[in-house]
Amino acid sequence: MPCASIWWPYLPPPTASQRPAVSPSGHILTSVNILELLAEIIVPTVSGIPAEAHPGRASAKLAADPQHASRLLSHNAKVPINRLPGELLLEIFYVHKLSSALRIGLTHVCHHWRELALTSPLLWTAICLEDRVEFVDACLRRSAVAPLTIVSRCYIEDELALMKFIAPHIGRIRALDLRSLSTSAAEALMRQSRGSKASMESVTLHVHPGCRSLTTPTFVLARNSTRQLRSLSLGGIAIAAPSSPLTALTRLDLTDTFLASTATIDDILDLLENCPRLETLSINERCRRFPVKSKSADRRVSISNLRHMRLAAHTALISGLLSCIILPSDTTLEIKCLISTHGVSPASIRTVLPDGLGGLGNLAAIRSLHVFVSSNIFRIRAYDMVGSAAIKKLDMDFDNDPPADMSSMLPQALVELARSFTSRGVRDLQIVGDYGLLIEGVWREVFAHLPYIQHIEIGSRGTVNKLFAALLAPSSADATDPSFCRDLRRIYIRGAQLDVDSAARMSTLAANRLLQNRRLDTLALSCYQRVRWILHFQMMVKRSRLWVSRFQFREDWIFMRTLR
């Protein structure tokens, strides 16, 4: 802290609210008095002179004016930071224990905070290997025998230096987070952990992507070191089958873990069988030649506590894994299918999702399907209900390498998606893409597999004639079927290309559904030919004389609501 006599001339004059009060004895307590008093104690200490060499002068000042000393002590006692209980302060400190700068700053606020921080071993258990050696040594010393959390985000290549630091403290490490290891450093760490008595709660070990190969280090799940393991994240490191169930494991993250040529889908299933309390699972595999056939065709693994599952791999691996697992109803499933350009086909969805959705119990309550197709993007979302309170149950993307146009996948992919959810009671269907590619036959087959559809929303470009033609003239098998779109009530179309023929089809559709007691409540369109189209539509309404529509305008939308 600089001396007050240096900085005081440069400070602005105090305002009325900042002027010191005059005490009954006539002594004025100002910032200068406090700074000068502290300077006599702090400056000698900072300059290397022992603090005990000059406390006499400060003590003499306080002794000469007991009232001043009493007021100073009373003032310090009323300062908010000195009135907080030590237990509460420590809880606040622990929130920032991963920040080295904040921990150093805590010791420089006041004597009370410094004493509290230095005597709290748990505050110094988080060690970042990028910090200065002096600070790391101080953390190890101040943490005493408390469990350690070791973190590093930089590339670690020297295994000898890493082992020199890790080995003496391996027994009290509770969380290890090393995100960028060389292969040699990872292998040395694996050897050290096998023979140790470490009992970690969280392990994150990732080999740098540039160092990964088919010959990967192997992480052995020994019984003595995994009984408290709650979180495991491996990248570019193989994992051996556990010798006993991992009863405490709730989070598992595997990236390029099964690169070896001998890896099979049974290796994944064996691991999942030994994780009875698993809640979060993430598997990211870029290997194209992964054997996906299970030794037992009827093998099924139930993951009863799983809440979130994320898969990023090629379609064959995803399909093989989804056909062998049983998921609970409240699981959120995220899928990213990696497909090559020559592998782009409408059958991709049928390849990924098992027939009848298999054991994917989380998709049993799907009520809303969203499909988005644009250039090299093909995305599917599925929700458990319609509206803002809906919970996403399926999030599936197709990723081409290299990028390719997937618009041609829309017709058949939409049919395959409808087949997969044919018995799921889907009420809402939203499609964004070039629906001009969808012919009448495609629309009819989609509606035939979604008999409970109530709401259709379509975006992007295309003509609407084929959609209304399919609703007007179903196939011969569905012509007399009263369940064909019997619940359809609302149709929203954005960017539609409208003409006289479109107006005629829409008017006829509304009239027919009204006669069949399947009234279409709302038909909303957003188009550029609004005025011309309204004239066409009103003309068709007058000709039909079977139903009356109430027009509403909102921004660029036209709402037609049927009135009885």
Which ranges hold each PLM region?
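Leucine-rich repeat
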Residues: M1-R564
